[in-house]
């Protein structure tokens, strides 16, 4: 199916490329005219273009002259002139496509064209990079073009506080990483004050290394969370010790391909004996199974120095695609805690989700989206299906002459590594630069050790040395350089033969004390001379390295994705330079062992001799087959993640929009009055027991429960007399009108006491508090639902359809609870006892936290943390910049109707189950035997988890009360 889509997509490429060529011709036709302009005339182009846009001209009409202007400014400030193919790439980006341009073709410079053009509209342009260093470096270097033309340039980096972030977002052009942009969006939707907002919309984004961000990281949702209730760290430590006593294949099974484990009968017996329990699979022990599975996964599937490193007592995840450390990220669902217990470091508390969004849904919010990469064509169908982005391959400026050799395959890793060292020694002896790509930190260190033994000087670039990656990559093309890199971690910095001129010039100026931030004028003044000086130094060495064959790229094993391999190969042969690449494989490599057992068997049958490799097209083809199988599986995972997130996205999109309206001061008084009416009607319907006759209603229960929400002054006997002759809907309406009228009168008295302005502010802040709290609980329940929804497939039901259906029901129930709790809090605050609105809100919070009718999970402390959690045991990412106020506000979701600025339930308000008063509001009866009256406890169960007894209550509200 994907192949058919690929062919269909390519059918229109010729027409698109012709349009791009026409743009390049139009820009070239203006070159002489623009080149003749003075610096002042060039600077005047920006206000001229803005005026033309205001007068009705489209960006497409302005594009040729705007591109020509940027090209001329680039020549004057950077000494770089955009090639025709770069002009074509710029047009492709402006029209909302992915420009596939090979490594070394100057993608960073290409982005300046559409970035400037779209920034003229004054709505902001976001340029998205893969790490903070590149965001900072590119904003400095390319910012010289923008600043010359009168544009403001901002850069978002991890350490910045909200006021600084707001300033950066208000710039015409803002650089930053995908995670920073995404987290700021989530934090904005947790803010309690308009002044706390930092972003100003999502107009146009250009994503650098778009395949890495929108494909490789698409399985990883961004999540802001804080510590959950309860301390269960002892269970992780206990199970870490327990699994050391278990034996693989005897006590448990491991499927490395699918990354799943299964406990066998002998293992179950050992676990039960160790824990002193009779039956591991009793409902009371449900939580223990999760600890056991995670402990086995930590032991067998997650390896130190491959999947993670341990630094200063902390477990840090290594990105499987780039080899970089992912600071602050954590595996989800208790897996990270299991690894911490395995390594004997501090086991940190589990987290509870406050706000979440996938990268897929975040980037689909932009009015226009574009991207750049050297390797997108293999995923063209996915880009179109998910993001509506076409992929346009842009030809290279000079013909590619790199030699890509067939793979060499050896029997064992030991034989392969010996051959690699021999090959590197030969290349190094003649001075040819060599780049060795490895798939893990562990592998890079093994190769480094062997090179040390062979006395071959080299640089290592892996997750443990990620701080110096750009500096190492910048000199990796110099004569005699040998660089060992994990999955080519330094993407974004070109490997130029002889050295990277711009990087070396920038480094020289900074070493002399000049920088764009601190001394911008001196930096600009000295840049041309320093650049020419470095160019002269590099030129001779560049020619010498070309004569030696250019950069030799040696892959020590194949990655699961063809794109990662192509990215490694793409480091060589830039801008028409010579180069060579080859991959060394062994039958023991993970890809071969797990995904192509048939090929391994065929090769073994040929009776390979020790140290003797096989070099054949069939081997390379077999590897590609294995890679396609993995890519197909990963694509299905990403599609599945998106399908499930789309359910939440519909709720999240509406409520975030409505929440922003409340935050920005819209009057919600009418909504509060509607909340009062809806809540009263819901209680009446819950008390009528399905009977149309008022005499059969539970009047005592109704007024007792209703008074916990609205302390009504209406007399029960009087109401019963008034509705005595009415039936059905008319009776409900009559009772509702009487109680609502009384409630409105009380509410009016409240307004007289606190003042109209004070009450409006109180309403806004109470609504935000309740929305955020209920949304947090809703996220928790939705996570729990998703965790177990796959089992519905065993009952011949579609898990996704079930998730949509039950998620919608839970969502509507949440809306009812939001209305009810908002009304309850507003009516239970003692306005006469508080002097200010702030004090009133404080009392509201205290009331909310102490009332036994409202379930409030604990939020983060003053150092609230944000995390990127992932589906299927991917990763989480922390952000310690969340301040205390944001940490309290835990995001909300709901649905809107008409012009209302607050959530309402769907087409028809959902009534409470079984025609009764809501569970949380029913009168407590001394005679009623509670589920937890049997005195049992269920060790290891989280406080917010459903109680294993089956009552449907959270553990802390059920048998958890028996814990001392």
Swiss-Prot record:
Gene3D superfamilies: 3.10.450.50, Helical scaffold and wing domains of SecA, P-loop containing nucleotide triphosphate hydrolases, SecA, preprotein cross-linking domain. It catalyses: ATP + H2O + cellular proteinSide 1 = ADP + phosphate + cellular proteinSide 2. Zn(2+) binds at residues 947, 949, 958-959. Residues 889-900 have a biased composition (Low complexity). Residues 848-964 are annotated as: Disordered. It holds the Pfam family P-loop_SecA. Its cofactor is Zn(2+). GO terms for biological process: intracellular protein transmembrane transport; protein import; protein targeting; protein transport by the Sec complex. May bind 1 zinc ion per subunit. GO terms for cellular component: cell envelope Sec protein transport complex; cytosol; plasma membrane. Belongs to the SecA family. PANTHER family: CHLOROPLAST PROTEIN-TRANSPORTING ATPASE, SECA INNER MEMBRANE COMPONENT OF SEC PROTEIN SECRETION SYSTEM. This is Protein translocase subunit SecA. The lineage of its organism: Bacteria, Bacillati, Actinomycetota, Actinomycetes, Bifidobacteriales.
């Amino acid at each position: 199916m994907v192949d058919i889509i690929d062919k269909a997509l390519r059918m229109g490429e010729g027409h698109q490329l012709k349009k791009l060529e026409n743009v390049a011709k139009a820009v070239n036709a203006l070159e002489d005219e623009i080149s003749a302009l003075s610096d002042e005339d060039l600077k005047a182009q920006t206000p001229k273009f803005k005026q033309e846009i205001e007068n009705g001209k489209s960006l497409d009409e302005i594009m040729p002259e705007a591109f020509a202007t940027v090209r001329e400014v680039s020549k004057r400030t950077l000494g770089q002139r955009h090639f025709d193919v770069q002009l074509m790439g710029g047009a492709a980006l402006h029209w909302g496509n992915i420009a596939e341009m090979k490594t070394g073709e100057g993608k960073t410079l290409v982005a300046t064209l559409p970035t400037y053009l779209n920034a003229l509209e004054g709505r902001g342009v976001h340029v998205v990079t893969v790490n903070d260093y590149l965001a900072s470096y590119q904003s400095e270097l390319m910012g010289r073009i923008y600043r010359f033309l009168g544009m403001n340039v901002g850069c978002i980096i991890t350490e910045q506080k909200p006021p600084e972030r707001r300033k950066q977002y208000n710039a015409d052009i803002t650089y930053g990483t995908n995670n920073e942009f995404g987290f700021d969006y989530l934090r904005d939707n947790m803010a309690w004050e308009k002044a706390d907002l930092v972003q100003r919309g999502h107009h146009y984004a250009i994503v650098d290394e778009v395949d890495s961000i929108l494909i490789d990281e698409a399985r990883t949702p961004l999540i802001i969370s804080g510590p959950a209730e309860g301390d269960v760290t002892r269970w992780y430590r206990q199970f870490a010790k327990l699994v050391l006593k278990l034996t693989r294949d005897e006590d448990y099974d491991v499927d490395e391909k699918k990354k799943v484990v299964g406990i066998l009968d002998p293992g179950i017996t050992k676990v039960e004996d160790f824990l002193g329990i009779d039956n591991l699979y009793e409902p009371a022990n449900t939580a223990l199974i999760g600890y056991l599975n995670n402990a086995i996964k930590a032991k067998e599937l997650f390896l130190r120095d491959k999947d993670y490193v341990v630094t200063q007592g902390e477990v840090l995840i290594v990105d499987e695609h780039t080899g970089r450390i992912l600071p602050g990220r954590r595996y989800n669902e208790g897996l990270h805690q299991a690894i911490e217990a395995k390594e004997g470091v501090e086991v940190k508390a589990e987290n509870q989700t406050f706000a979440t969004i996938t990268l897929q849904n975040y980037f689909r919010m932009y009015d226009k989206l574009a991207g750049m990469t050297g390797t997108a064509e293999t995923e063209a169908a996915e880009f179109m299906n998910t993001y509506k982005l076409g992929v346009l391959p842009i030809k290279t400026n000079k013909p590619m002459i790199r030699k890509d050799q067939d793979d060499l395959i050896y029997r064992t890793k030991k034989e392969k590594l010996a051959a690699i060292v021999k090959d590197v020694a030969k290349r190094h002896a003649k001075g040819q630069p060599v780049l060795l790509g490895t798939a893990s930190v562990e592998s890079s260190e093994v190769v480094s050790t062997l090179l040390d033994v062979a006395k071959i000087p080299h640089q290592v670039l892996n997750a443990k040395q990620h701080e110096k990656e750009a500096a190492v990559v910048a000199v990796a093309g110099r004569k005699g350089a040998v660089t060992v890199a994990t999955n080519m971690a330094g993407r974004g910095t070109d490997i130029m033969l002889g050295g990277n001129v711009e990087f070396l010039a920038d480094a020289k100026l900074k070493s002399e004390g000049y920088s764009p931030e601190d001394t911008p004028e001196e930096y600009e003044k000295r840049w041309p001379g320093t650049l020419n000086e470095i160019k002269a130094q590099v030129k001779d060495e560049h020619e010498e390295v070309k004569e030696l064959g250019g950069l030799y790229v040696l892959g020590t094993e194949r990655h699961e994705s063809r794109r990662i391999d192509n990215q490694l190969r793409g480091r060589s042969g830039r801008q028409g330079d010579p180069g060579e690449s080859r991959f060394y494989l062994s039958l023991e490599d993970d890809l071969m062992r797990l995904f192509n057992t048939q090929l391994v068997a065929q090769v073994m049958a040929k009776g390979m001799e020790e140290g003797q490799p096989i070099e054949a097209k069939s081997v390379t083809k077999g590897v590609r087959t294995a890679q396609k199988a993995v890519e197909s599986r990963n694509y299905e995972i990403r599609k599945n993640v998106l399908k499930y997130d789309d359910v939440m996205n519909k709720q999240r999109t509406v409520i975030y929009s409505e929440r922003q309206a409340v935050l920005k001061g819209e009057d919600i008084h009418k909504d509060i009055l509607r909340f009062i009416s809806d809540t009263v009607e819901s209680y009446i319907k819950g008390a009528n027991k399905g009977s149309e006759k008022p005499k059969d209603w539970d009047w005592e229960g109704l007024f007792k429960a209703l008074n916990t929400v609205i302390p009504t002054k209406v007399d029960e006997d009087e109401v019963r007399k008034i509705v005595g002759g009415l039936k059905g809907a008319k009776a409900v309406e009559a009772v509702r009108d009487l109680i609502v009228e009384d409630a409105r009168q009380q509410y009016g008295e409240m307004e007289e006491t606190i003042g109209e302005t004070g009450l409006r502010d109180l309403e806004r802040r109470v609504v935000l508090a309740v929305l955020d709290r209920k949304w947090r609980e809703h996220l928790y329940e939705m996570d729990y639902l998703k965790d177990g929804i796959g089992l519905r497939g065993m009952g011949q039901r579609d898990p996704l359809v079930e998730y949509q259906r039950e998620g919608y029901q839970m969502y509507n129930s949440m809306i009812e609870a939001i209305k009810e709790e908002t009304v309850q809090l507003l009516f239970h605050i003692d306005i006469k006892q508080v002097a200010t609105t702030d004090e009133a809100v404080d009392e509201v919070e205290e009331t909310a936290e102490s009332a036994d009718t409202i379930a409030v999970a604990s939020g983060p402390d003053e150092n609230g943390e944000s995390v990127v959690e992932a589906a299927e045991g991917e990763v989480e990412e922390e952000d310690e910049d969340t301040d205390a106020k944001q940490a309290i506000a835990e995001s909300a979701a709901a649905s809107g109707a008409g012009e209302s600025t607050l959530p309402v339930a769907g087409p028809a308000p959902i009534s409470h189950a079984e025609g009764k008063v809501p569970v949380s509001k029913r009168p407590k009866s001394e005679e009623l035997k509670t589920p937890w009256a049997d005195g049992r406890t269920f060790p290891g169960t989280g406080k917010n988890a459903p109680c294993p007894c089956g009552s449907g209550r959270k553990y802390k509200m059920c048998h958890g009360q028996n814990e001392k």
